[in-house]
Amino acid sequence: MRILFVSNYNAWDKVGKGVMPSHHLFGVNEMIDHFETPDSAILKSQFGGGKIDFVKVANPSKIELLKLYAKCFSYDVVYDVLTAVSKQFGILNKFHLFRPRLVTIFHHPPFDKMMKYAKSDCSVFFTEELMNEAQKSIQDNRQVVCNRWYPEKAWYDINKLTLESKKVYDFLDNGKTARDHNLFIRCMRLMPNNRAVIVTDKKHIPTEYKEGENVDLFFQDEPNDLTMLQLCLKTKVMVIPLEENKKMLGPIGATSYMDTIALGMPVVTNEKAAFAKEIVDNGIGCLFKLNEESLAKALVQSLEKYDKLHNAMVSFSGSHSISKYTEMLNKYLFKKNV
């Protein structure tokens, strides 16, 4: 078995160096016996043995796509974890012009064009709601599955041993994509006795931010998991203030959500978040509608119920890890019935 892992960032390098948790490899790290080179690894015998190669594909040119297309014929499976090539190769696959099995994680709707004009042999979604939305546009017998993404808790447990964990902040907002930081800042003004920190870069400073208030800015140009771990350990509650969207939200904020699960942090997020139902069903956080009154209420509730939410998240974390994702992924990659 030969697998080609395709992503738009080289997580395998950072995971190998221990500076990034392995859930950024979307289940394959647990299948690896050892790396032969920085970009190539041998699979464990229980996963059929064989080899997995890693390739970064970000905004490829036509020539780069042609070269990659030719390369793919040497593999049994192409695992596209961030939909980097499935639009192009999926069209070829639909017309039986793509030899390997194409397994794709679909993250953000709308899915209609991708489902109609391209075909992945196995389409993976992080929630049942996203999967059901995609199926509305499918008219063939392709495999469509839900496989919920969860964190590699061991990475957090090991790395937090050497870090300070005294709580300095009540709230952490550490995302950039589709976040309403200004709404969060306005709500914090209603809570002058509490403190928060927002992770951003100098090009995207929230317009509502005023120096000297109860919200600090932490500047970071490139993602750094160890830095985020330190901030998480200094904070009680994670806030994911997703922007309002009339359409279904994809798993935006999922990386921050992984941090909360691994560390037992209660979470506050938009009721339209992809993982909102899971939060409610397991009592691990508070949801809000996108207005100041609702968010402020959710922030207050998360502190009032902190111990209960924290304990529930710790319990949830114990039974929801990347190993569950790997177990299901193994079936998809090797064409086993699920």
Where do the protein language model's features map onto the residues?
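Conserved donor-binding/catalytic core segment of Leloir-type glycosyltransferases
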Residues: L163-H181, I185-M191, V197
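A charged, aromatic-enriched C-terminal amphipathic alpha-helix characteristic of glycosyltransferases
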Residues: L290-E292, E304-F334
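Nucleotide-activated donor-binding/catalytic signature segment of Leloir-type glycosyltransferases, i.e.
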Residues: P206-V237
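Donor nucleotide-sugar binding/catalytic pocket of nucleotide-sugar-dependent glycosyltransferases
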Residues: D121-I158
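N-terminal subdomain of nucleotide-sugar transferases
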Residues: M1-Q46, R189-P192
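Nucleotide-sugar-dependent
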Residues: L226, I240-M258, T269-K277
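A short alpha->beta transition loop at the rim of the catalytic pocket in nucleotide-sugar-dependent
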Residues: K236, G264-P266
